[in-house]
Amino acid sequence: MRLYLFTLLVTVFSGVSTKSPIFGPQEVSSIEGDSVSITCYYPDTSVNRHTRKYWCRQGASGMCTTLISSNGYLSKEYSGRANLINFPENNTFVINIEQLTQDDTGSYKCGLGTSNRGLSFDVSLEVSQVPELPSDTHVYTKDIGRNVTIECPFKRENAPSKKSLCKKTNQSCELVIDSTEKVNPSYIGRAKLFMKGTDLTVFYVNISHLTHNDAGLYICQAGEGPSADKKNVDLQVLAPEPELLYKDLRSSVTFECDLGREVANEAKYLCRMNKETCDVIINTLGKRDPDFEGRILITPKDDNGRFSVLITGLRKEDAGHYQCGAHSSGLPQEGWPIQTWQLFVNEESTIPNRRSVVKGVTGGSVAIACPYNPKESSSLKYWCRWEGDGNGHCPVLVGTQAQVQEEYEGRLALFDQPGNGTYTVILNQLTTEDAGFYWCLTNGDSRWRTTIELQVAEATREPNLEVTPQNATAVLGETFTVSCHYPCKFYSQEKYWCKWSNKGCHILPSHDEGARQSSVSCDQSSQLVSMTLNPVSKEDEGWYWCGVKQGQTYGETTAIYIAVEERTRGSSHVNPTDANARAKVALEEEVVDSSISEKENKAIPNPGPFANEREIQNVGDQAQENRASGDAGSADGQSRSSSSKVLFSTLVPLGLVLAVGAIAVWVARVRHRKNVDRMSISSYRTDISMADFKNSRDLGGNDNMGASPDTQQTVIEGKDEIVTTTECTAEPEESKKAKRSSKEEADMAYSAFLLQSSTIAAQVHDGPQEA
């Protein structure tokens, strides 16, 4: 094989550059007559994809003379042997140069712009002479750590003779191995001489785990003396050419490592070059650099030694030279196969800057915004939790078409927002076990993978959103309402209720959108957003969320589980929202029932304003019956007559008292109607009724007008001066009680009067018995 077909290509890439987003190889080496391909990367923007690309040579004066450009320009010295190709889909352009000469050695720039002073990257090209080798020399080119098999032919007459391989050093040839199993100490365990099958005209020497020291000239020989068969071999051992990786800040990168079947069973690793050493950042034995905690995975691909390492949430300091390898220790070892990369992190990232750490409290919630490529709005979105055990893995917890994992039932949902480049993941009912690292993923552009660290602290106060009770039961076929209380800071935000399922959380319609089976209403004055199920069906059972959001940005949420059951006979279901009202009614009924006459054991149902008159009539009729029975009686009836007279003398005054009470109630009702009619007068500015006066104190001056949550409006010279207090203050405990109108006060006075009258009657009745 002719020598010029083999090229020594050593590429060394520069460190992180923050001055220019253009990236390429810093040094390129080759030999005369060979060719090189130089790849330069540029940021992913429409302008960069369509602007001029160029390759120029720097002179002693600092000027850079264009040799070739994407506009079609080609200099004379490159005519017929160079071209420039733009790959906009990869955001790269490649300069190919053939028939290299030593005159091509020099300093160059690859760049973008209408002039050569635009964005650029410096490249040094060195072209060396072809090494002088014997004409019959066979050249083998291998990478460090790989194996080489040298083929040594011979004549049949030398078949019984000794075979050997030696390495030339100065004027001598040092033995490597021979057919008598003699091996140089430097090659023990690495060199092997053998023949294949029945072919007696060729022997082979295999050398494994090649190092730089193995490079040089070798001679393989069969036989001795002038009749011996000899062959010259030139072994070139090169460091693997680094692969360029151009990634945006906050994006992800994957290192695909293929080391060969011979190391399939060895431990694998990825390390980063640090001057003369390579520091392991992860290996399959469980070692992991703390700087990459929560954002790195190592994954075996197959049984042929292939594996990959994924790093998400790239930072500026992640740029550098990386190397993957395999060894039983999980650490870099000389003579073992490796692959190398040069990673460039572009700070002009298209991925939006999001919080890398989200904080929550136990019992609370978090809403995490995950970015994705806006051009791939139809892509599937996922959210997974990073686990560091073993080689690390990230099981999917929820996705746009993936059901929520069972352990996250009722507290995890993904909200897809097509078109704006963001989807939101909400996790509520937080516990300390939820703390950890989570990844945002799509099935589209793999660069758009981001990492979020969730920190959960113990709650020190009540949550902002409160739904009580936490476990509610609704009755089938009835109306059920549950309310969610929110603080003042959420006043301007949109409030919503949604029904959770393992495919998401469906937002329920509000009353403004029309009456439906499930609807939501919001009372801003009481800071309550209520959800009503009307009528309740079995399908309504499950988890519901109350939450707030600002436009497309989701905020806090809280969850409640609503059970649905059928009504059983003799049971009555009390809606939590009506509990206080029903308790008040029960109290009033208890006051009225206390007026039952113990003697007659008859209750007065639905006592009205004239109930006392009916009771007086009943008492009068009963007195007349007692007198009639006294006149028709015998001597024994005369004793009863005396008792009847005592009872009559007692009940007559009682009847008079009841009559006076009835008159008092009638007067109070008449006055109430007059007051209402009098205060119903309205002007074009103000409507006033008795219900507007909370109590007698409201008729006086207000000591704290600034604390009023209502808008105060004053007309000055035909202009409206509106003063609105946005501060939300809590009313005193007394003011939170239900305010009574004049009618309610009269009813309460009447009920108390009946109770007192019943007590007096009982005392009078017991008096004669004791006598």
UniProtKB/Swiss-Prot annotation:
InterPro entries per record: CD300_family_receptors, Ig-like_dom, Ig-like_dom_sf, Ig-like_fold, Ig_sub, Ig_V-set
Biased composition (Low complexity): 627-641
Subunit structure as annotated in this protein's UniProt entry: Interacts (mainly via CDR1-like domain) with dimeric IgA. Interacts (mainly via CDR2-like domain) with pentameric IgM.
Any one annotated GO CC term: secretory IgA immunoglobulin complex
The record's note on its domains: The Ig-like V-type 1/D1 domain contains three complementarity determining region-like loops CDR1-3, which mediate interaction with IgA and IgM.
Residue numbers on the Extracellular membrane side: 19-645
GO BP field: detection of chemical stimulus involved in sensory perception of bitter taste; epidermal growth factor receptor signaling pathway; immunoglobulin transcytosis in epithelial cells mediated by polymeric immunoglobulin receptor; receptor clustering
GO MF, one annotated term: polymeric immunoglobulin receptor activity
Membrane spanning stretches: 646-668
Description of post-translational modifications: N-glycosylated. N-glycosylation is required for anchoring IgA molecules to mucus, but is not necessary for Ig binding.
UniProt signal peptide: 1-18
Gene3D superfamilies: Immunoglobulins (2.60.40.10)
PROSITE patterns named in the record: IG_LIKE (PS50835)
Name of this chain's protein: Polymeric immunoglobulin receptor
Cytoplasmic topological domain residue ranges: 669-771
Sites where a glycan is attached: 90, 147, 170, 206, 420, 471
Keyword Transmembrane: yes
Disordered as annotated region, ranges: 622-641
Species whose genome carries this gene: Mus musculus
Intrachain disulfide bonds: 40-110, 152-220, 257-324, 370-440, 484-546
Modified residues (Phosphoserine): 680, 689, 696, 742
